[in-house]
Structures are given as structure tokens and as C-alpha cells.
């Protein structure tokens, strides 16, 4: 059990500028949240035929796509899965923030929990829809702490 990574502890200290990579559907809720963070941000394309590759550390901000109640399938958007299937993109992810809708009950923010477990990175926060001023401040603070984390 000693080799099991701790889920909310960074695996390493991020390097370079604080950045976010995010996915936002055509509703642009996640984009609106990211715009308010005031950090350099890269958007994962909506079209599955388009690809991006990053060469810098980042926090992934991802909406949750799940049907609610007991429908836990498909919580991470396909575009995000495709982006993370590239080893370089996956290795540069140092943390996750998720959004969701509390109307969907137990699946609220589920993408964040799935990604945290798969990527072995901390889940920094889960916010609803476009978030609040409090969510923005908390995410900025936690990203800053992550970049300044000491082992």
C-alpha cells in the first residue's frame, strides 16, 4: 500500500507559468469561469477532429457530463479523454478542477473525481455551472498554492 499515490497530493511541483487547460461546450460555462480566473488558458477543441498538444504544466478545468441519479457513464467529455490520451498532455496535468450541476445529484462534479483518480493529481475544487466569485478566488488561490508547493 505504500506505493499507492495519495489522491490529493501533487506528484511533483509544477514548473513554468501558472496555466489552465479547459474544455467548454457551446454553452461556454467553463470558458466563462476560466476567463474570470485571469490566467493563461488553452481551450481543448470542441470538434473531435481537431487536436492540441501542450508542452507546459497546467491545471485541467473540466465540466461533468453525466445523466444524474445512477448514470455515472460518460462523465468526462470525449474531447478531454482524447486530449489526455496523448502522453505529453497527460504528463503535464498537475491538478484538476471540475464543474457540474447540482440538479444531477450524486454525479455533481463527477468528472473531477474520475480524472483525479486516473491522473493521480489533486482535485482542487468543484464548482456549479459558471461558478461564483468565491469559486474563482478559491481556484486561483489553490492553483497558486500548487505552483508554490514544497515536498
From Swiss-Prot:
Molecular function in Gene Ontology: FMN binding
Domain of life: Bacteria
Gene (name only): nrdI
HAMAP family xref list: NrdI
Role description: Probably involved in ribonucleotide reductase function.
Name this polypeptide is given: Protein NrdI
BP GO terms, sorted: protein modification process
Pfam families for this protein: Flavodoxin_NdrI
Similarity comment: family membership: Belongs to the NrdI family.
Amino acid at each position: 500500500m505504500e506505493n499507492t499515490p495519495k489522491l490529493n497530493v501533487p506528484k511533483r511541483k509544477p514548473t513554468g507559468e501558472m496555466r489552465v487547460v479547459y474544455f467548454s461546450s457551446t454553452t461556454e460555462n467553463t470558458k466563462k469561469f476560466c476567463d474570470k480566473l485571469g490566467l493563461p488558458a488553452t481551450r481543448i477543441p470542441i470538434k473531435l477532429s481537431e487536436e492540441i498538444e501542450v508542452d507546459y504544466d497546467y491545471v485541467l478545468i473540466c465540466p461533468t457530463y453525466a445523466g444524474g441519479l445512477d448514470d455515472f457513464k460518460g462523465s468526462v467529455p470525449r474531447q478531454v479523454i482524447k486530449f489526455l490520451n496523448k502522453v505529453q498532455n497527460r504528463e503535464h496535468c498537475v491538478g484538476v478542477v471540475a464543474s457540474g450541476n447540482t440538479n444531477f445529484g450524486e454525479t455533481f462534479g463527477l468528472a473531477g473525481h474520475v480524472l483525479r483518480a486516473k491522473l493521480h493529481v489533486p482535485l482542487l475544487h468543484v464548482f456549479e455551472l459558471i461558478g461564483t466569485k468565491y469559486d474563482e478566488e478559491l481556484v486561483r488561490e489553490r492553483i497558486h498554492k500548487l505552483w508554490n508547493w514544497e515536498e
